[in-house]
Amino acid sequence: MLLNTLLIAIALLSAAILLAKRVRDNAMWRATVTPLASIIGSGFLVVVPLLGHSVGGYAPVAMAAVVTLAYFIGSAIRFNILYMEPVLAAPHSSTTAIGRVNTISEIALGIAYFISVTFYLRLLSSFVLRGFQIDSDIVAQSITSVILLGIGIAGWFRGLAFLERLEEYSVSIKLAIIASLLFGWLMHDLSNLQSIHIAATLPSDLDWWYVVRLMAGVLIVVQGFETSRYLGDQYDGATRVTTMRRAQLLSGAIYIAFIIVTVPSLVLLGDDVSETAIIDLSRVVSVVLPPMLVIAAAMSQLSAAVADTVATGGLVTQVSGSRFQLPAKAGYLLVSLVGVILVWTTDIFEIIALASRAFALYYALQCLGATMVAWQQQKDARNPWHVAGFALLSALLFVAVVIAIPAD
């Protein structure tokens, strides 16, 4: 009873701090929220059962490896913010090799965003309906369409500021619940130290090739940091670089901590690797955690969808260039309209695999572009480690495009 009360109090206190006006109005925090919302998105709750089934007690090591690789990929995006963007701002840059690579990568990203925003909100609709014991594709598609149009229309009339506020509230609620979750699970582990036996062993039926492909898919789960690249109309390069780095470090710490505290409970998992698996498992910690995690899951879908919508606005502005000069709000409306079409004409749960590969292709091309920019720098400014590192990342990501198993 005491733990239940304490967990609710921690969640409420954390939410109060994050939603305080001083925090909400902080420009650095607002710029951090967009990548943070996208990184801790739909795959957050499914990572634990996925890694638990595939690598057993080595799940924290696997998660740390994925987060570290994602951070290095983020360094390529940050490099591009500082050094590629000035190159792309030059006249006729779109006809250069760097310009073409960047354009192709952004087309891939646009496709991924259109699908992922629709996927997040369709998942949100299903999650809400499941709570009311309603299983209807028509109702879920209708709710998804209403939310999509609501976000698009609000973005068109109210602009980026409104969408950022929506992000802030949903991310703050999600982070508050995560803080409560981590504390509760840690207390559960500490109170059961005598009976905890964590074996750093791998499953007996381990398939290494499957694990490698799955890790490539998990890498896409922690994507979203690239959204900072497309906030250029609102924030300067230095701000976007700093806040992207903070978002990656904070989200990485959360992912790793989440895996560590849940590892002792992995033996209780069945064969279910869906989001509901970890929600059901949280009952061993506290009766208040399952409903809190349902709210956190819903906020994850909403905040990730809004974050990708915001990034799509900046992406549309960049891709349209000086010839068409489409404003960011056109991107908000476009992604909502395309989403409505997708939700009624496709099985969004089937084509999400295409989005995962498109994200991997985007990162591969961005790393390739970073390699080209680093190579073209003056000899006295050229860093051979940048050239070699970005080239290696690009090669690894091109392989991931082909072999990755989507983890969402």
What does each model-found stretch correspond to?
Residues 90-91, 121-143, 233-237, 242-252, ...:
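Helix-loop-helix connectors at the membrane interface of multi-pass transporters/channels
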Residues 20-22, 137-139, 143-145, 161, ...:
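Helix-loop-helix junctions that connect adjacent transmembrane segments
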Residues 1-21, 46, 61, 181-184, ...:
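A generic transmembrane alpha-helix motif of multi-pass inner-membrane proteins
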